[in-house]
Structures are given as C-alpha cells and as structure tokens.
Regions:
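Sec/Tat signal peptide C-region and signal peptidase I cleavage site
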Residues: 12-18
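Amphipathic, charged alpha-helical segments and their helix-to-coil junctions
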Residues: 19-164
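Sec-dependent N-terminal signal peptides
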Residues: 3-12
C-alpha cells in the first residue's frame, strides 16, 4: 500500500511538471495587426475632424472676446451683460463639445478595437491548443519566469495573423 501510494505521488508530481507553459505579449500582437493600423488611421481622422470643429468654436470665441474688449468701455450695462452671457454660453458650448468629442473618440476606439482583440484572442487560443500548452501567461504580468521553461508564442501568433 505504501509503495502504491509512493508511485501514485511520483506519477502525479511528474504530470504536474509535464505541463507546457507559454507566454504572450498580446499588446505586441495587436499593434502589429493590419486591422489595428487601419483602426488607428480611422481614429486619427476622427480626432482631426473633431479638433477642427473645436478650433472653429475657439476662433469664434476669441473673435467675440476681442470685440467685447474693444467695445466694453462704451457699452451700456444691458449690452455688456448680454455680451458676457453670450461669451459664457460660448465657453460652455466649447467645454461641452470637448467632453462629447472625447466620449465619441472613446466609443469609436472601443467599437474598432473589440473585433481586433477578439481576433487576437482567438489566434492565441488556436496557437496555444495546437502547441499543446496548458497555460499561457501575459508577458507583462509575469514577475519572474525561466525562459528555458516558458516559451514565448508571440511570434507564432503574429505569424498566424499576418502581423509584422
């Protein structure tokens, strides 16, 4: 009985050490995908468009500030209050536009990145299964690993996705 228990323990511990462990830099995979580069191009175009719209509002505001400053001394109180309200409203509009623009960019980024990340995760899973890996760790999350014992599958996943 003791011999059987010892043999079972040795076999169990051997099977634990036989696990195939890999690592991946998913960020490296994603940023090298053609889809990611296209998404970045779309995001940059959207950001440029939103920036141009914001600059238009800013120019309008600067013009009205200059007009206000030039005529402030000769304005009646009623006109001055009206102009100040107009400037405050324009400033509020600019701040609101900035906030909406940031939200729009974040939403678009999430919309574009979701299928890219899904595709990368599917490729990681396929390469992991094909390679017989039992565990894959994210490289950036590992504090220590023995490079001889943990294979980096990043190049294989990039090759599967056609990412340079």
């Amino acid at each position: 009985l003791k011999l059987t228990l010892a043999v079972v323990c040795v076999m169990f511990s051997t099977s634990l050490f036989a696990q195939k462990i890999g690592r991946i830099s998913s960020q490296e995979v994603v940023v090298n995908m053609a889809e990611y580069k296209e998404a970045q191009t779309q995001l940059e175009a959207l950001a440029k468009d939103l920036q141009a719209q914001m600059e238009t509002i800013q120019v309008e505001m600067n013009t009205k500030i200059q007009e206000y400053q030039k005529g402030a001394e000769t304005m009646t109180d009623a006109v001055r209050q009206l102009k100040e309200k107009e400037l405050n409203d324009l400033n509020t509009r600019l701040q609101e536009f900035n906030q909406v623009a940031q939200q729009e960019l974040q939403k678009k980024e999430q919309e574009l990145m979701e299928p890219i990340i899904k595709k990368a995760n599917e490729a990681i899973t396929e390469v992991s299964k094909a390679g017989g890996y039992t565990v894959i760790f994210e490289t950036g999350q590992m504090i220590y690993f023995d490079e001889a014992q943990v294979k980096d599958i990043t190049p294989e996943v990039k090759a599967k996705l056609g990412a340079n």
